[in-house]
Amino acid sequence: MIRSVSFSLGLLVVIGSFVLANKQQKQSAPPPPPKVLMIGDSLSVAGFGDAVREHLEHRIGRENVAFFASCGSSPENWLQNEQVFHTRCGYREKTPTTDVYRDYHNGRRPPAVATPKIETLIERYKPTIVIVQLGTNWMDQTLSDNHIRAVLARFVSAAHRGGVRRMIWIGPPDSSRFSKVQNRIYRLIQQSLPRGDPVIDSRRFTRYVSGKTGGDGVHYNSESGAAWARPVNASIDQVLAADIAARRKVASNR
């Protein structure tokens, strides 16, 4: 009788330990990686964009990265209520299911491509982080501060609508052509983004040398673009790490 009771108690202890261990194992399962949507202009169509996209794919997996770049575009061109912007100088799209590249070939202009809308992309890919590389094409336009602020307010609202996500804004790199107006564009972007959405100041990592960096004072060749991407990727990694840690904490408290 005593042996039977002892055996039963021992069996209960073993079963209880198994259940507890199984529960702890389920709780300690890592959360899914972040999902990233990146959009950009001509600077992302070329080498810089490829370097950032490939880094993200390596870091969190190709299935978690959606990348779009439209030459000549500015934030307003990505907004739902604005006229569709057809780029005629280059387009790049790389997602888990698509791979599109349009650029000049043997001096021939690429076919026009419609720039997608950020609201549609967010609905489709459901990102937890949105990376934006835009603002370059504002530097050669005579737009008022109020106009740019209004566009940025709508853009920020669209990027955050329908979910809790962070936005990382990659500011324009050093430009020998528009260096005088860059401070203004940066100031407006920084003032418009909410706390918690970092602006990466690319000027800290770049210096445009005509004939070496590129030929027009704005665009970066493949080598210079890759060099610019390295410190930008390091900055993005910090945000990704914080996002993963925060979601791991939430998962462990469930």
Segments the model singles out, each with a brief description of its role:
Residues 33-38, 43-145:
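Conserved SGNH/GDSL esterase-like catalytic core that processes O-acyl groups on lipids
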Residues 61, 173-254:
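Catalytic His-Asp segment of secreted/periplasmic serine-dependent ester chemistry enzymes
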Residues 49, 53, 115, 119, ...:
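Extracytoplasmic/secreted envelope proteins and their assembly/folding machinery
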Residues 131-140, 153-186:
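Active-site segments of SGNH/GDSL-like serine hydrolases
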Residues 140-152, 215-220:
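Active-site cleft segment of glycoside hydrolase catalytic domains centered on the general acid/base Glu
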Residues 67-69, 171, 201:
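Residue-level recognition of beta-strand->loop/alpha-helix junctions
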Residues 45-46, 141-142, 149, 176-179, ...:
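Loop/helix-junction capping segments adjacent to catalytic residues or to phosphate/diphosphate-binding pockets
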Residues 1-39, 43-67, 123-126, 232, ...:
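N-terminal secretory targeting modules
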